[in-house]
Amino acid sequence: MIHQQTEIRIPVGSVKVEGTLTLPSGAKGVVLFAHGSGSSRFSTRNQYVAKEFNKSALGTLLFDLLTAEEEETDVLTAEFRFNIPLLASRLIGVTEWLRNDPKTKNMAFGYFGASTGAAAALIAAAKLPGEVAAVVSRGGRPDFAGKYLASVVAPTLLLVGGLDTEVIELNEQAMEQMTSEKKLVIIPGATHLFEEPGKLEEVAKFSIDWFLRYLR
């Protein structure tokens, strides 16, 4: 399968964020990755999942929610990593940019969020009800989305490791507040980062099935 891959800089508010847009031939949808704190678009886990998506004709955009300068500051002060409204606003800005780009303007969009990035994805989905076709949360903290959970209309898949007991409970509580179609899948034997053999492959499989169902 032929992929068209482009390094892009997207203006969002007063800054520009950097990303990698990959569009396989025949792609009808694009999945935007919202990474968690301390991660980036170069994360080996997200890179692996993105490649699996591409093999299934799903486009992907891996981008950094923070600028390089903000990342440097965050390492020292942690002032940005839990600023979920800021992260959500960046995701919204990037989504709107894709909607206006000739290559992607007619495609369906999905969000793949990890850890705190999942909360940002859910807030963005709540604020863009007509734009986001589906959301997948990997080891996410949907509880950080707070009051916005009830406003999410996009079908949402919550993936949590079976050994990540605290996060399982938080996801169960968040599900109770959601009125959209939602599903919680607990992956046995997996911890928070799904580092155990074969567990990230399961994440990719469940996610691909979900996105292919809704990104049309």
Language-model segments: residues:
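Conserved alpha/beta-hydrolase "acid-adjacent" motif
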Residues: 165-170
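Catalytic active-site module of serine/aspartate enzymes centered on a nucleophile-bearing elbow/loop
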Residues: 198-216
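A conserved short beta-strand
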Residues: 130-142
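Short beta-strand immediately N-terminal to the catalytic nucleophile in serine-hydrolase-like folds
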Residues: 110-113, 138
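Gly/Ala-rich beta-loop-alpha elbow adjacent to hydrolase catalytic centers
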Residues: 113-121
